[in-house]
Amino acid sequence: ERKIQEPYVCIAVQSTAQAKHWNNGPGWAEVVSHLKELGYRVLCIDRNAHSGHGFVWNHIPWGAEDFTGALPLQERVDLLRHASFFIGLSSGLSWLAWATRIPVILISGFTLPNSEFYTPWRVFNSHGCNGCWDNITYNFD
């Protein structure tokens, strides 16, 4: 059953490593603002509204609705399957969105495009960090 009647988009702005995040200062705020101008509600479905260590912290983007929390997997699936599309990073929520068969815009760089599922909507810049995670000569521990 669809609980939210208005058109909406799900986003997930966090991942397991800071290098997997979209470290573009105003990037998420601009995306959320644009989507809202197009008439979408924007739901952030990360586990936590804030995460980080030391002096580097990531927060739910300004203007996004807080649907974070330790939700059962089925509740996240229900949110995703009724979304118009999903925007996220190289993370488990992106895979979950892909599994629900909605369009996924994947922002990546730390991993190579062939490390994840195929999506025609991939944001990937090969001029910065690209594929670092897939290079076995790098020690991330």
Residue ranges and their predicted role:
Residues 1-21:
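Mid-sequence helix-capping/hinge segment at a functional interface
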Residues 13, 44-56, 133-141:
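Short regulatory "switch" loops immediately downstream of catalytic or recognition motifs
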Residues 17, 62, 127:
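Residue-level signal for pocket-adjacent positions within structured domains
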Residues 18, 74, 114, 130-131, ...:
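A broad, structure-centric signal for solvent-exposed, well-ordered loop/edge residues
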Residues 13, 69, 109, 125-127, ...:
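Active-site donor-binding loop signature of nucleotide-sugar glycosyltransferases
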Residues 1-2, 119-141:
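Leloir-type glycosyltransferase catalytic cores
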Residues 22-115, 120:
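Donor-binding and catalytic core of enzymes assembling or modifying cell-surface/extracellular glycoconjugates
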